[in-house]
């Protein structure tokens, strides 16, 4: 399927998932515009989140939740929700997104799959200037790599400086500035936080690339939506990744997917 046709399909499905249940997207949240084209969401005017969001097990003890709900092999509807002062879930943003080329269910390095489970964001970084990120942000440079070096002591699945590890296995590591479109803004998802060699590395939330309607295992959003996430993310944000069919069977059935 051509990229444009696939994007149109994903947009339609994302709208269908949100609109019957609650307002979808940032327009309903009456956001305050910023010079970075992002939004700092005012929860007092934001739309209610879809009912199924608050019914998730992960939502019970969370104040903010980020959901990647797979709807196709490489597509997802991606949304962020936050409790207001009364404990009601409000939708900060919702957008189409891309997941791994081979879908959901990551188990090893290089399988081109996005992991399923409950995670957290551990690090905010990117090639671009700080977009007024709500948590600490690091602007990467030419010396920064994400280590895919499985040798002991080379910090597999961590950001490293090449000057500290001059013999780093760069072939299997990511030179972050080389991904000039995708890594404008990134949040690291703490999949394989223990750094078990071969289990997988460099699983990020990042901006969409220019051509491919999938990722190597990360989650990709339009750049403007990524800015919204960066400007509203909390340190304790809970990240949930699974299929929509698993997260909300009723919604899946209503959409006849």
Functional labels for PLM-detected ranges:
Residues 1-11:
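Bacterial N-terminal signal peptides that target proteins for export
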Residues 11, 29, 40-42:
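N-terminal non-cleavable signal-anchor helices
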Residues 11-17:
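Hydrophobic helical h-region of N-terminal Sec-dependent signal peptides
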Residues 28-32, 63, 216:
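Short, solvent-exposed beta-strand edge segments and adjacent coil->beta transition regions
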């Amino acid at each position: 399927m051509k990229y444009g046709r696939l994007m149109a399909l994903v947009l339609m499905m994302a709208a269908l998932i949100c609109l019957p249940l609650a307002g979808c997207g940032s327009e309903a949240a009456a956001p305050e515009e910023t010079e970075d084209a992002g939004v700092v969401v005012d929860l007092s005017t934001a739309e209610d989140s879809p009912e199924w969001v608050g019914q998730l097990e992960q939502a019970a003890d969370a104040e903010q939740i980020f959901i990647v709900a797979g709807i196709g092999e490489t597509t997802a509807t991606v949304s962020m929700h936050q409790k207001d002062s009364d404990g009601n879930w409000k939708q900060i943003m919702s957008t189409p997104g891309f997941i791994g080329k081979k879908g959901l269910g990551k188990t090893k390095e290089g399988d081109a799959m996005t992991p399923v489970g409950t995670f957290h964001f551990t690090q905010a970084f990117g090639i671009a200037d700080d977009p007024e990120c709500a948590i600490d942000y690091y602007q990467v440079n030419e010396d920064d790599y994400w280590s895919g070096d499985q040798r002991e002591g080379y910090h597999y699945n961590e950001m490293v400086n090449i000057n500290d590890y001059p013999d780093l296995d760069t072939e299997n590591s990511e030179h972050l500035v080389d991904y000039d479109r995708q890594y404008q803004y990134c949040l690291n998802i703490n999949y394989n936080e223990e750094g078990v060699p071969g289990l997988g590395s460099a699983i990020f939330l990042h901006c969409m690339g220019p051509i491919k309607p999938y990722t190597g295992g990360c989650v990709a959003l339009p750049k403007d939506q990524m800015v919204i996430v960066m400007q509203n993310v909390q340190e304790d944000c809970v990240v949930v990744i699974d299929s929509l069919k698993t997260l909300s069977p009723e919604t899946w059935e209503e959409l006849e997917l």
